[in-house]
Regions:
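Thiamine diphosphate
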Residues: 7-20, 26
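FAD/FMN-dependent oxidoreductases across multiple families
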Residues: 114-159
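Short, ordered loop/turn segments at secondary-structure junctions
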Residues: 6-7, 31-34, 164
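Short secondary-structure boundary/hinge segments and terminal tails
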Residues: 36-38, 137-138, 304
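Flavin (primarily FAD) binding-site architecture
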Residues: 1-5
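Glycine- and aromatic-enriched mobile tails/lids
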Residues: 61, 66-70, 77, 140, ...
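An anion/pyrophosphate-binding glycine-rich loop and adjacent beta-alpha core
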Residues: 18, 24-132, 193-199
Length: 336
Protein backbone atom coordinates (compact mmCIF):
# COMPACT_ATOMS: atom_id res chain seq x y z
CA UNK A 1 0.00 0.00 0.00
CA UNK A 2 3.06 2.26 -0.32
CA UNK A 3 4.36 3.57 -3.65
CA UNK A 4 7.91 2.43 -2.93
CA UNK A 5 7.86 -1.09 -1.51
CA UNK A 6 9.64 -4.43 -1.56
CA UNK A 7 6.32 -6.24 -1.21
CA UNK A 8 4.89 -8.15 -4.18
CA UNK A 9 1.69 -6.84 -5.76
CA UNK A 10 -0.19 -9.78 -4.24
CA UNK A 11 0.58 -8.37 -0.78
CA UNK A 12 -1.85 -5.52 -0.18
CA UNK A 13 -3.21 -6.07 3.35
CA UNK A 14 -5.93 -8.57 2.45
CA UNK A 15 -5.28 -10.79 5.49
CA UNK A 16 -5.50 -7.89 7.93
CA UNK A 17 -8.60 -6.52 6.18
CA UNK A 18 -10.40 -9.89 6.29
CA UNK A 19 -9.59 -10.42 9.97
CA UNK A 20 -10.64 -6.86 10.86
CA UNK A 21 -13.99 -7.19 9.09
CA UNK A 22 -14.57 -10.45 10.97
CA UNK A 23 -14.15 -8.48 14.21
CA UNK A 24 -10.54 -9.27 15.16
CA UNK A 25 -8.57 -6.76 17.22
CA UNK A 26 -5.64 -5.11 15.39
CA UNK A 27 -2.66 -3.56 17.15
CA UNK A 28 0.55 -1.57 16.48
CA UNK A 29 -0.69 -0.67 12.99
CA UNK A 30 1.46 2.49 12.88
CA UNK A 31 4.75 0.57 12.92
CA UNK A 32 5.99 0.13 9.34
CA UNK A 33 9.65 -0.68 8.83
CA UNK A 34 11.31 1.00 5.85
CA UNK A 35 14.41 -0.59 4.38
CA UNK A 36 17.01 2.07 3.51
CA UNK A 37 18.57 0.54 0.40
CA UNK A 38 15.99 -0.21 -2.23
CA UNK A 39 17.55 -0.12 -5.71
CA UNK A 40 16.01 2.85 -7.51
CA UNK A 41 15.82 1.20 -10.93
CA UNK A 42 12.18 2.05 -11.69
CA UNK A 43 10.89 -1.41 -10.75
CA UNK A 44 7.74 -2.28 -8.81
CA UNK A 45 8.24 -3.91 -6.39
CA UNK A 46 11.60 -2.34 -5.60
CA UNK A 47 14.52 -4.82 -5.37
CA UNK A 48 16.69 -4.66 -2.27
CA UNK A 49 20.42 -4.24 -1.80
CA UNK A 50 21.08 -6.32 1.30
CA UNK A 51 22.79 -4.85 4.39
CA UNK A 52 25.53 -7.42 3.86
CA UNK A 53 26.90 -5.26 1.02
CA UNK A 54 27.40 -2.38 3.45
CA UNK A 55 28.95 -4.85 5.87
CA UNK A 56 31.35 -5.75 3.06
CA UNK A 57 32.52 -2.15 2.68
CA UNK A 58 29.88 -0.28 0.64
CA UNK A 59 29.18 3.36 1.56
CA UNK A 60 26.06 5.52 1.44
CA UNK A 61 26.76 8.77 -0.41
CA UNK A 62 24.95 11.68 -2.02
CA UNK A 63 25.62 13.09 -5.50
CA UNK A 64 28.66 14.91 -4.12
CA UNK A 65 30.01 11.55 -2.90
CA UNK A 66 29.67 12.71 0.71
CA UNK A 67 29.16 9.92 3.25
CA UNK A 68 26.21 11.46 5.06
CA UNK A 69 26.01 8.74 7.76
CA UNK A 70 29.43 9.66 9.17
CA UNK A 71 29.00 11.04 12.68
CA UNK A 72 25.30 10.12 12.82
CA UNK A 73 25.93 6.77 14.53
CA UNK A 74 29.07 4.92 15.70
CA UNK A 75 28.41 2.21 13.11
CA UNK A 76 28.01 4.78 10.29
CA UNK A 77 26.33 2.96 7.34
CA UNK A 78 25.58 -0.05 9.56
CA UNK A 79 23.37 1.93 11.96
CA UNK A 80 19.86 0.53 12.64
CA UNK A 81 17.57 0.46 9.61
CA UNK A 82 15.19 3.14 10.84
CA UNK A 83 18.04 5.60 11.49
CA UNK A 84 19.62 4.96 8.08
CA UNK A 85 16.24 5.27 6.33
CA UNK A 86 15.49 8.54 8.14
CA UNK A 87 18.81 10.06 7.06
CA UNK A 88 18.32 8.90 3.48
CA UNK A 89 14.91 10.56 3.56
CA UNK A 90 16.47 13.74 4.95
CA UNK A 91 18.98 13.84 2.08
CA UNK A 92 16.18 13.39 -0.47
CA UNK A 93 14.09 16.12 1.23
CA UNK A 94 17.08 18.45 0.88
CA UNK A 95 17.08 17.81 -2.87
CA UNK A 96 20.01 15.39 -2.91
CA UNK A 97 20.24 12.09 -4.75
CA UNK A 98 21.44 9.11 -2.70
CA UNK A 99 23.57 6.19 -3.81
CA UNK A 100 25.16 2.95 -2.68
CA UNK A 101 28.89 3.09 -3.42
CA UNK A 102 30.07 -0.50 -3.95
CA UNK A 103 33.33 0.35 -5.69
CA UNK A 104 35.45 -0.79 -2.75
CA UNK A 105 33.51 -3.99 -2.17
CA UNK A 106 35.12 -7.38 -2.82
CA UNK A 107 35.95 -8.27 -6.44
CA UNK A 108 33.65 -11.26 -5.98
CA UNK A 109 30.55 -9.01 -6.03
CA UNK A 110 28.76 -11.04 -8.72
CA UNK A 111 29.42 -14.28 -6.85
CA UNK A 112 28.48 -12.99 -3.40
CA UNK A 113 25.49 -10.87 -4.46
CA UNK A 114 24.21 -12.45 -7.69
CA UNK A 115 20.68 -11.06 -7.43
CA UNK A 116 21.83 -7.47 -6.94
CA UNK A 117 24.42 -7.93 -9.72
CA UNK A 118 21.66 -9.18 -12.02
CA UNK A 119 19.47 -6.12 -11.36
CA UNK A 120 22.47 -3.84 -11.94
CA UNK A 121 23.26 -5.52 -15.25
CA UNK A 122 19.64 -5.14 -16.40
CA UNK A 123 19.80 -1.44 -15.47
CA UNK A 124 23.07 -0.99 -17.38
CA UNK A 125 25.13 -0.32 -14.24
CA UNK A 126 28.40 -1.85 -13.11
CA UNK A 127 28.74 -1.79 -9.27
CA UNK A 128 32.54 -1.84 -9.62
CA UNK A 129 32.43 1.47 -11.49
CA UNK A 130 29.02 3.12 -11.02
CA UNK A 131 27.20 4.50 -8.00
CA UNK A 132 23.89 2.66 -7.52
CA UNK A 133 20.84 4.93 -7.04
CA UNK A 134 18.82 3.95 -3.98
CA UNK A 135 15.74 5.01 -2.03
CA UNK A 136 14.12 3.89 1.26
CA UNK A 137 11.18 1.53 0.74
CA UNK A 138 8.33 0.08 2.81
CA UNK A 139 9.53 -3.36 3.78
CA UNK A 140 7.81 -4.93 6.79
CA UNK A 141 4.60 -4.31 8.74
CA UNK A 142 5.29 -4.90 12.41
CA UNK A 143 1.65 -4.39 13.40
CA UNK A 144 -1.32 -6.44 12.32
CA UNK A 145 -3.86 -8.84 13.81
CA UNK A 146 -3.30 -9.08 17.56
CA UNK A 147 -2.36 -12.59 18.66
CA UNK A 148 -0.98 -14.31 21.72
CA UNK A 149 2.15 -16.45 21.59
CA UNK A 150 0.05 -19.40 20.41
CA UNK A 151 -1.23 -17.50 17.37
CA UNK A 152 -4.75 -17.06 18.76
CA UNK A 153 -6.61 -13.89 17.82
CA UNK A 154 -9.46 -12.21 19.70
CA UNK A 155 -11.93 -14.29 17.65
CA UNK A 156 -12.58 -17.89 18.59
CA UNK A 157 -11.32 -20.16 15.82
CA UNK A 158 -9.28 -17.51 13.99
CA UNK A 159 -5.51 -18.01 14.07
CA UNK A 160 -2.82 -15.83 12.51
CA UNK A 161 0.87 -16.11 11.78
CA UNK A 162 3.44 -14.43 9.56
CA UNK A 163 3.47 -10.74 8.69
CA UNK A 164 -0.31 -10.47 9.06
CA UNK A 165 0.06 -11.16 12.80
CA UNK A 166 1.18 -8.80 15.55
CA UNK A 167 2.73 -11.11 18.13
CA UNK A 168 4.73 -8.39 19.88
CA UNK A 169 8.09 -10.09 19.30
CA UNK A 170 9.48 -7.15 17.30
CA UNK A 171 8.57 -4.42 19.75
CA UNK A 172 8.56 -1.12 17.86
CA UNK A 173 11.25 -2.18 15.40
CA UNK A 174 12.36 -5.38 13.69
CA UNK A 175 15.83 -6.84 13.57
CA UNK A 176 16.89 -8.24 10.19
CA UNK A 177 15.67 -11.81 9.55
CA UNK A 178 13.46 -11.89 12.67
CA UNK A 179 10.50 -12.28 10.32
CA UNK A 180 11.56 -15.94 10.26
CA UNK A 181 10.18 -16.18 13.79
CA UNK A 182 6.74 -15.03 12.65
CA UNK A 183 6.66 -17.21 9.55
CA UNK A 184 8.45 -20.44 10.43
CA UNK A 185 8.26 -20.64 14.23
CA UNK A 186 4.75 -19.26 14.69
CA UNK A 187 3.62 -20.97 11.50
CA UNK A 188 4.54 -24.30 13.05
CA UNK A 189 2.98 -23.39 16.41
CA UNK A 190 -0.30 -22.32 14.78
CA UNK A 191 -0.42 -25.43 12.57
CA UNK A 192 0.13 -27.71 15.58
CA UNK A 193 -2.53 -25.91 17.60
CA UNK A 194 -5.09 -26.11 14.79
CA UNK A 195 -4.33 -29.79 14.17
CA UNK A 196 -4.91 -30.55 17.85
CA UNK A 197 -8.48 -29.23 17.68
CA UNK A 198 -11.44 -31.54 17.03
CA UNK A 199 -12.66 -31.49 13.44
CA UNK A 200 -15.81 -29.43 12.98
CA UNK A 201 -18.28 -29.44 10.16
CA UNK A 202 -17.85 -26.26 8.10
CA UNK A 203 -20.86 -24.53 6.61
CA UNK A 204 -20.87 -24.03 2.86
CA UNK A 205 -19.89 -20.60 1.59
CA UNK A 206 -22.88 -18.48 0.66
CA UNK A 207 -22.88 -18.21 -3.19
CA UNK A 208 -24.26 -14.66 -2.89
CA UNK A 209 -21.01 -13.67 -1.17
CA UNK A 210 -18.97 -15.10 -4.08
CA UNK A 211 -21.08 -13.19 -6.61
CA UNK A 212 -20.70 -10.00 -4.58
CA UNK A 213 -16.91 -10.42 -4.48
CA UNK A 214 -16.76 -10.95 -8.26
CA UNK A 215 -18.91 -7.88 -8.77
CA UNK A 216 -16.44 -5.80 -6.74
CA UNK A 217 -13.50 -6.86 -8.89
CA UNK A 218 -15.02 -6.28 -12.33
CA UNK A 219 -13.58 -2.78 -12.78
CA UNK A 220 -9.92 -3.55 -12.15
CA UNK A 221 -8.59 -1.25 -14.87
CA UNK A 222 -10.44 1.77 -13.48
CA UNK A 223 -9.34 0.80 -9.97
CA UNK A 224 -5.65 0.95 -10.90
CA UNK A 225 -5.73 4.75 -10.98
CA UNK A 226 -7.06 4.88 -7.42
CA UNK A 227 -4.67 2.18 -6.22
CA UNK A 228 -1.74 4.28 -7.40
CA UNK A 229 -3.23 7.43 -5.83
CA UNK A 230 -3.55 5.56 -2.52
CA UNK A 231 0.00 4.20 -2.64
CA UNK A 232 1.42 7.61 -3.53
CA UNK A 233 -0.46 9.35 -0.73
CA UNK A 234 0.56 6.76 1.86
CA UNK A 235 4.21 7.10 0.87
CA UNK A 236 4.07 10.89 0.84
CA UNK A 237 2.06 11.42 4.03
CA UNK A 238 2.41 8.30 6.19
CA UNK A 239 5.89 7.27 5.10
CA UNK A 240 9.20 7.38 6.92
CA UNK A 241 8.54 10.71 8.68
CA UNK A 242 5.00 11.71 9.69
CA UNK A 243 3.44 14.68 11.46
CA UNK A 244 -0.04 15.93 12.32
CA UNK A 245 -0.52 17.78 9.03
CA UNK A 246 0.65 14.90 6.83
CA UNK A 247 -1.50 12.41 8.76
CA UNK A 248 -4.63 14.52 8.29
CA UNK A 249 -3.80 15.04 4.59
CA UNK A 250 -3.34 11.31 4.19
CA UNK A 251 -6.68 10.61 5.87
CA UNK A 252 -8.50 13.10 3.61
CA UNK A 253 -6.84 11.51 0.56
CA UNK A 254 -7.95 8.00 1.55
CA UNK A 255 -11.53 9.11 2.25
CA UNK A 256 -11.69 10.89 -1.14
CA UNK A 257 -10.40 7.77 -2.90
CA UNK A 258 -12.99 5.70 -1.03
CA UNK A 259 -15.84 7.98 -2.14
CA UNK A 260 -14.78 8.06 -5.78
CA UNK A 261 -13.98 4.35 -6.14
CA UNK A 262 -16.98 2.79 -4.44
CA UNK A 263 -17.66 -0.72 -5.76
CA UNK A 264 -14.70 -0.79 -8.16
CA UNK A 265 -12.42 -3.36 -6.58
CA UNK A 266 -12.33 -5.65 -3.55
CA UNK A 267 -8.53 -5.29 -3.53
CA UNK A 268 -8.77 -1.49 -3.39
CA UNK A 269 -11.36 -1.73 -0.60
CA UNK A 270 -8.92 -3.80 1.46
CA UNK A 271 -6.10 -1.34 0.80
CA UNK A 272 -8.31 1.56 1.88
CA UNK A 273 -9.32 -0.23 5.07
CA UNK A 274 -5.76 -1.13 6.10
CA UNK A 275 -4.56 2.39 5.24
CA UNK A 276 -7.20 3.85 7.57
CA UNK A 277 -5.99 1.69 10.45
CA UNK A 278 -2.35 2.67 9.84
CA UNK A 279 -3.29 6.36 9.71
CA UNK A 280 -5.29 6.17 12.95
CA UNK A 281 -2.42 4.41 14.72
CA UNK A 282 0.03 7.05 13.46
CA UNK A 283 -2.28 9.82 14.67
CA UNK A 284 -2.75 8.34 18.14
CA UNK A 285 0.96 7.74 18.81
CA UNK A 286 2.11 11.27 19.58
CA UNK A 287 5.78 10.36 20.00
CA UNK A 288 8.64 8.84 18.02
CA UNK A 289 9.40 5.20 18.81
CA UNK A 290 11.24 2.57 16.81
CA UNK A 291 10.27 2.82 13.15
CA UNK A 292 7.44 5.29 13.89
CA UNK A 293 8.92 8.77 13.50
CA UNK A 294 6.94 11.97 13.97
CA UNK A 295 8.67 15.25 13.23
CA UNK A 296 6.25 17.07 15.57
CA UNK A 297 6.84 14.63 18.46
CA UNK A 298 10.51 13.73 18.22
CA UNK A 299 10.97 12.22 21.68
CA UNK A 300 10.06 8.78 23.01
CA UNK A 301 7.59 9.22 25.88
CA UNK A 302 7.10 6.87 28.85
CA UNK A 303 3.32 7.40 28.80
CA UNK A 304 3.25 5.82 25.32
CA UNK A 305 4.69 2.47 26.43
CA UNK A 306 1.44 0.88 25.32
CA UNK A 307 -0.31 -0.67 22.33
CA UNK A 308 -3.14 0.96 20.42
CA UNK A 309 -5.74 -1.75 19.84
CA UNK A 310 -8.19 -0.99 17.02
CA UNK A 311 -11.40 -2.63 15.81
CA UNK A 312 -13.39 -2.36 12.60
CA UNK A 313 -16.55 -1.49 14.56
CA UNK A 314 -14.83 1.60 16.02
CA UNK A 315 -13.29 2.80 12.75
CA UNK A 316 -15.88 5.36 11.63
CA UNK A 317 -16.19 6.95 15.07
CA UNK A 318 -12.38 7.21 15.38
CA UNK A 319 -12.11 8.89 11.98
CA UNK A 320 -14.93 11.33 12.80
CA UNK A 321 -13.26 12.19 16.10
CA UNK A 322 -9.88 12.81 14.43
CA UNK A 323 -11.37 15.01 11.71
CA UNK A 324 -13.43 17.02 14.23
CA UNK A 325 -10.37 17.63 16.39
CA UNK A 326 -8.37 18.68 13.31
CA UNK A 327 -11.15 21.06 12.18
CA UNK A 328 -11.38 22.61 15.65
CA UNK A 329 -7.60 23.10 15.76
CA UNK A 330 -7.66 24.78 12.32
CA UNK A 331 -10.54 27.02 13.41
CA UNK A 332 -8.62 28.17 16.50
CA UNK A 333 -5.58 29.00 14.34
CA UNK A 334 -7.74 31.10 12.00
CA UNK A 335 -9.36 32.95 14.95
CA UNK A 336 -5.98 33.65 16.55
Amino acid sequence: IFANTTNPRSSYGEGIALAAQAGAVLTDMEFIQFHPTGLDFGLDPTPLATEAIRGDGAYLVNQNEERFMLGIHPENELAPRDLVAQNLFKQIEQGNSVFLDCRKVSNEFETKYPQVASYCQAAGLNPKIDLLPILPVAHYHIGGVKTDLEGKTSIEGLWCCGEVAATGIHGANRLASNSLLESMVFGRIVAKNINSLPIKKVNKINPDFIRMHKEKTKNRIRAKKYIWQLRSSMMRNIGIVRNHSSIIRGLHDILKIERESKGLSAKLNDMILVSKFIIIGAYLRKESRGCHLRSDYKNTEDNFILHFDLKFSDLDSKITEILNLADNANHKQVVN
